[in-house]
Amino acid sequence: MIKNLQYFQPQEPKFGEITYKDIEEEGISAEEKSRRCWRFYLSKDDSIVTDLFLGQFRSTLRCTECQHESVTFEPFWIVSVPLAKDTIDIQECMELFVKAETLDEDEMPTCEACKQRRKCIKWYSFEKWPSVLIIHLKRFGPSASYRAKLTNKIQTPLRNLDLRYVELERDRVIWHGSPKWQKFQPKMPW
């Protein structure tokens, strides 16, 4: 059924068509990589549904040893946000989602620059917002013997969810702007 909603796409590759190899090209800026990833995804699935519901995450992984940053971009349809026991509004849930986490011990990735398994900091931010944002609340949390359902009530507006609050990475400056053009940044541990 989704195939029927897709815009007409010629079967032959077009001149200048983006490939996965182009996305992983070294030396391109994060913004250019974001644009290429977006075009690559839309070349595979471009429809009225993607126009309405598709957004893009920016995933950043920073090595704590050499400070090298690896940036990837991922499309999303739904944002699954965690709940804390004391969470009371959707804004807090979104802040938990973009909160930086430390990957160490068994979770340590291999740093692209060091070529060694290193402790890293990972966080998500929103690169592109969809026209219609779908938020899934993760209502089940870990418990000692079973997965407990979190039953706390979450306050959320029915219209016009305000995601303008942005905290810049290094400057720790609060910035108010339009969510269509600004990125929702994580609280960094430094």
Where are the regions that the model predicts?
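Active-site nucleophile-adjacent alpha helix/oxyanion-hole segment immediately C-terminal to the catalytic cysteine
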Residues: 1-11, 62-65
